[in-house]
C-alpha cells in the first residue's frame, strides 16, 4: 500500500486511495502522483495568496484547501503552472508527467465522484518531447571498459558488465535474476509489466558467468 499521506487536501488523499484500491496502481506510481499534485497545490496556494510570500514551498500547508477552492481551478491556472514548472527547469517529460497527474485527478473529480462538471485540463496538449536516440558503446570502448574494472568484487562486476553489454537488459531486470532463470545457454528476463523473454547467452556471457 501507498504511504499514509497527510500533508495534502482531503480530495487528493481520496484520489490516491482510489488509485490504490480501484485502479491497482503501484506504490511508485501513486507516490509520483502525490508529489506532482502536492507541487501543483503549493503553487495554487501562492496564486490564491493563501501562503506568506516568504514561506518556502515545502512548508506551505495544504491540508485546509477546500473542495470549493479546488473547483475554482481553471484552464489558465493549469497552463500558468506548466509555465511555472518550465521556469523552474522542469523539462518536457516532467511537465507532461505533471499534466498527466492533473488530468487524472480532475478527471476523477468529474467522472467518478461528480464534484466538477468540467475538467480544466481538457484540450491542453503538450508537444511531444523529443526522443533521444540510445547511445551505444563501440567494440573498442566496450573492451576498454572491461579492462578497467577496479573492484573488490571483480568477477561479479565483470560478469554484470558483460551481461549489460551482450544481453540488452536494464538494471531493474538484472537485479531480479535468480538462479532458476538460467537454463542451458539461455536466461529468462522479466521486464516491464512482468513480461518475460528468453535471451541467448553467447560464449562471452557463459564464460563470465562460469568464472563468477
Report residues per predicted region.
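Conserved catalytic core of the tyrosine transesterase superfamily
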Residues: 1-212
Amino acid at each position: 500500500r501507498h504511504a499514509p499521506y497527510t500533508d495534502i487536501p482531503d480530495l487528493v488523499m481520496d484520489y490516491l486511495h482510489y488509485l490504490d484500491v480501484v485502479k491497482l496502481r503501484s506504490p511508485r506510481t501513486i507516490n509520483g502522483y502525490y508529489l506532482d499534485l502536492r507541487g501543483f497545490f503549493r503553487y495554487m496556494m501562492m496564486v490564491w495568496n493563501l501562503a506568506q510570500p516568504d514561506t518556502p514551498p515545502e512548508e506551505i500547508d495544504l491540508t485546509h484547501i477546500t473542495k470549493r477552492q479546488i473547483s475554482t481551478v481553471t484552464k489558465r491556472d493549469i497552463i500558468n503552472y506548466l509555465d511555472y514548472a518550465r521556469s523552474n527547469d522542469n523539462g518536457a517529460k516532467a511537465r507532461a508527467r505533471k499534466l498527466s497527474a492533473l488530468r487524472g485527478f480532475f478527471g476523477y473529480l468529474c467522472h467518478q465522484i461528480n464534484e466538477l462538471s468540467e475538467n480544466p485540463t481538457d484540450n491542453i496538449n503538450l508537444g511531444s518531447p523529443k526522443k533521444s536516440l540510445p547511445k551505444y558503446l563501440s567494440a573498442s570502448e566496450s573492451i576498454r571498459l572491461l579492462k578497467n574494472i577496479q573492484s573488490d568484487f571483480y568477477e561479479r562486476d565483470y560478469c554484470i558488465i558483460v551481461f549489460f553489454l551482450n544481453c540488452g537488459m536494464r538494471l531493474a531486470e538484472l537485479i531480479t535474476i535468480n538462479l532458476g532463470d538460467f537454463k542451458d545457454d539461455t536466461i529468462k528476463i522479466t521486464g516491464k509489466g512482468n513480461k518475460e523473454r528468453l535471451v541467448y547467452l553467447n560464449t562471452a556471457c557463459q564464460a563470465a558467468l562460469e568464472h563468477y
